[in-house]
């Protein structure tokens, strides 16, 4: 799980805000980022653009159903919006227009995702999905 300034879109203004994360964790970001505390709509980039910079390499994001502070929907929109750049590289993702139901992972794709039932945490379920995704990306266990 990540949330604001992780996978979730900052300019969506849902859950944790740029101002809140800068206030709670002032050591995480440089002072320039704090200039956007009260004008998040002026940010020159948003998270989907940063995810797209990873193309054509694989990316896996995750959320948790009870972690509304981290905006699970915004995280899925973000990774979905990054698909456009992957397409430029000829990489087709297995993402669906709508987020998958909780506890359903998208593994066999260049862009992977799951929304686990529960709170903001990293659980054995999450680690298991990360490992399956990595194995798939490295050609281990492909069907």
Q: Where are the regions a protein language model picked out?
A:
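Conserved alpha/beta-hydrolase "acid-adjacent" motif
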Residues: 68-78, 123-126
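Short, proline-enriched alpha-helix->beta-strand connector loops that line the catalytic pocket
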Residues: 53-59, 107-111
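C-terminal catalytic histidine-bearing segment of alpha/beta-hydrolase fold enzymes
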Residues: 24, 80, 86-143
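Arginine residue identity/basic-tract feature
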Residues: 11-12, 57, 116, 142
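Conserved strand-to-loop "acid loop" that flanks and positions the catalytic carboxylate
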Residues: 55-72, 116-118
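Mobile cap/lid helix-loop segments that gate and shape the active-site cleft of serine hydrolases
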Residues: 1-50, 75-96
């Amino acid at each position: 799980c990540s949330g604001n300034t992780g996978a979730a879109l900052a300019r969506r203004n849902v859950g944790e805000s740029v101002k809140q994360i800068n206030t709670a964790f002032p050591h995480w970001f440089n002072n320039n980022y704090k200039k956007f505390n009260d004008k998040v709509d002026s940010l020159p980039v948003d998270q989907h653009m940063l995810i797209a910079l990873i193309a054509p390499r694989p990316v896996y994001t995750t959320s948790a159903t009870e972690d509304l502070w981290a905006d699970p929907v915004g995280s899925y929109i973000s990774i979905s919006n990054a698909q456009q750049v992957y397409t430029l590289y000829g990489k087709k993702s297995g993402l669906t227009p709508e987020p998958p139901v909780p506890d359903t992972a998208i593994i066999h794709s260049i862009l992977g995702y799951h929304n686990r039932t529960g709170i903001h945490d990293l659980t054995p379920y999450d680690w298991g999905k990360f490992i399956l995704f990595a194995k798939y990306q490295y050609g281990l266990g492909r069907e």
